[in-house]
Regions:
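Bacterial Sec-dependent N-terminal signal peptides
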Residues: 1-39, 477, 483-487
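Transmembrane beta-strand segments of Gram-negative outer membrane beta-barrel proteins
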Residues: 35-76, 86-97, 178-184, 455
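Short loop/turn motifs that connect adjacent beta-strands in outer-membrane beta-barrel proteins
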Residues: 35-40, 82-94, 120-124, 166-179, ...
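Transmembrane beta-strands of outer-membrane beta-barrel pores
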Residues: 45-53, 82-84, 99-105, 121-123, ...
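Residues on the lipid-exposed face of transmembrane beta-strands in outer-membrane beta-barrel proteins
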Residues: 76-84, 115-119, 128, 159-165, ...
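Surface-exposed loop and membrane-interface regions of Gram-negative outer-membrane beta-barrel proteins
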Residues: 89-121, 133-152
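Internal, well-ordered domain-core segments that constitute the primary functional module
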Residues: 136-236
């Protein structure tokens, strides 16, 4: 397709997306009147300060890009939502609309954070919009973040079709469960590449059953950046339907793509696989998981991967009888191997120096608004002092510990991470080792007699040569409740 025809195709896709959103919006209003639903609200005030020029590591990372880089900042959030129904209905839907005012030393601005509508018919889901998503096998509250997808970057507008939650297949006792689907969307930051497109699909299998104490889980993920207008000689990248099929199949680009894209694959592709084991005992729940990524080669099953030394390994132990220490987590992250230091391995085979989250064509890499979409320990460009837009530190080793629990009416969370940072293979073999210790203590309490609010305090600490020495304090006040109920 010509560039003009390709843009016509993209405009048609966007218009159809808007049409679907409007259709669901109209349906939502009729559903509210017909069935009756509870609409909830939340107001949140979050303010922090720190001893250096930026906020501590765990203050600003894995926060969906909502916390500014600056040391002193305040966010005022407002959210309206309708949650998923508790009962298993044939049809269900949920939506969220949220925004915030961000105030810092450098700027103040109004941000639209989430705006999406999700509908489910039987086991199938369809959603449109921007939403906070949790993807992967890692722990949701204590993890350092998934390897390919974490909670680090701002949501982007996407369309999803698929089976969102694990669904029994053939067996009534849930012996075999599956989930999977496909996302397509747009990067909205426009940092380097204009109108960059997003593609992501996944498939997971879980074996065990409701009567078994052991569950095994395995999943595959494929994500890609494609299309867009690249500055300089490369210019407009192809975005026709044939190009989308090539991206979907991870095949070489069309004749309109760059020569390297034609030889390799069209776009920037990252594959991931993960495995998880869950063990349920009388007093404990134990979960162990592993994640790996592949940047320029097909995924090899588990231990056959060329970069098998790289990955995220984690284990959690949940205590059912002692709430003071309710859950403990340990994770080890390694990304130093990257299939070796040389892309030209032997003059025939090419595949080393994977340089995770970087790409020669899309130089902003696997990021959105200056933050990595995957693990935050592959350092986000927002930390780059020279204002470069790419990843300057993607060879890391991390030991991460998390603990959470309750004491009377207080709940707490502790994160502690120790990292070794080696930069990228472009620094090899003269790389400079930089270390860092990053800690977070968070305590929250619900005050029913004080306007029914939740108050939380946080203390963050950074120490070392990677992110510097820094101490921060944060205060959070939130109030949530029922906005209205339609019978």
């Amino acid at each position: 397709l010509s560039h003009k025809a390709s843009w016509r195709f993209l405009r048609i896709v966007k218009m159809r997306t808007i049409t679907i959103l409007l259709f669901f919006g109209a349906f939502l209003l009729s559903a509210l009147k017909a069935e009756g639903d509870t609409i909830r609200y939340q107001l949140l005030w979050n303010s922090m300060t720190a001893t250096t020029g930026n906020s501590p590591f765990w203050f600003q990372n894995n926060r969906y890009g909502t916390v500014p880089f600056d040391a002193t900042n305040t966010n005022l959030f407002a959210t309206i939502r309708k949650d998923k129904s508790a009962n298993d209905k044939l049809f269900d839907y949920n939506f969220v609309a949220s925004g915030y005012v961000g105030i810092s030393n450098k700027q103040s601005a109004l941000y639209l954070h989430e705006l999406y509508l999700n509908a489910r018919l039987w086991v199938f889901n369809a959603s449109v919009g921007m939403r906070e998503e949790f993807q992967g096998t890692q722990d949701e509250t204590l993890s350092s973040g998934g390897l390919l997808f974490s909670q680090n970057a701002r949501p982007m507008p996407k369309v999803f079709i698929g089976i969102e939650d694990f669904t029994p297949l053939f067996f009534k006792n849930k012996m075999l469960e599956v989930k999977g689907g496909m996302y397509n969307g747009w990067f909205t930051d426009q940092v380097y590449t204009q109108n960059l497109l997003f593609h992501h699909k996944f498939a997971y299998l879980r074996v065990g059953g409701i009567h078994s104490p052991i569950h095994l889980q395995y999943g595959l993920e494929h994500a890609a950046q494609w299309g867009g207008i690249v500055p300089g000689e490369y210019g407009q990248q192809p975005i026709g339907f044939t190009d989308f099929i090539n991206v979907f199949r991870a095949r070489g680009g069309s004749s309109a793509a760059t020569l390297f894209e034609q030889i390799n694959v069209g776009g920037n592709h990252i594959m991931s696989q993960s495995a998880k084991v869950e063990l349920k005992l009388s007093k404990y729940d134990i979960k162990a998981y592993w994640q790996n990524i592949s940047e320029d080669q097909p995924v090899d099953f588990l231990w056959n991967s060329v970069n098998v030394a790289d990955g995220l390994w984690g284990i959690t132990v949940q205590n059912k009888a002692f709430p003071f220490i309710q859950k403990v987590l340990y994770e080890y992250l390694n990304t130093t191997d990257q299939s070796g230091p040389f892309h030209d391995m032997d003059g025939v085979v090419y595949g080393g120096n994977d340089s995770y989250f970087n790409n020669y064509l899309y130089q902003n890499g696997w990021t959105h608004y200056g933050r990595t979409i995957g693990t935050p320990f592959i350092t986000s460009p927002i930390y780059n002092k020279n204002k470069e837009i790419g990843i300057l530190n993607n060879r890391v080793q991390v030991h991460h510990i998390g603990v959470e629990g309750y004491y009377h009416e207080y709940n707490y969370r502790i994160l502690s991470s120790f990292t070794k940072n080696y930069g990228t293979y472009s620094d090899y073999p003269n790389e400079t080792l930089r270390t860092s210790t990053n800690m977070l203590l968070e305590v929250n309490k619900h005050f029913e007699k004080i306007w029914n609010v939740d108050i939380g305090i946080q203390v963050g600490l950074d120490a070392g040569s990677m992110y510097g020495n820094n101490t921060g304090f944060a205060l959070k006040i939130s109030k949530k409740g029922i906005l209205f109920h339609i019978k």
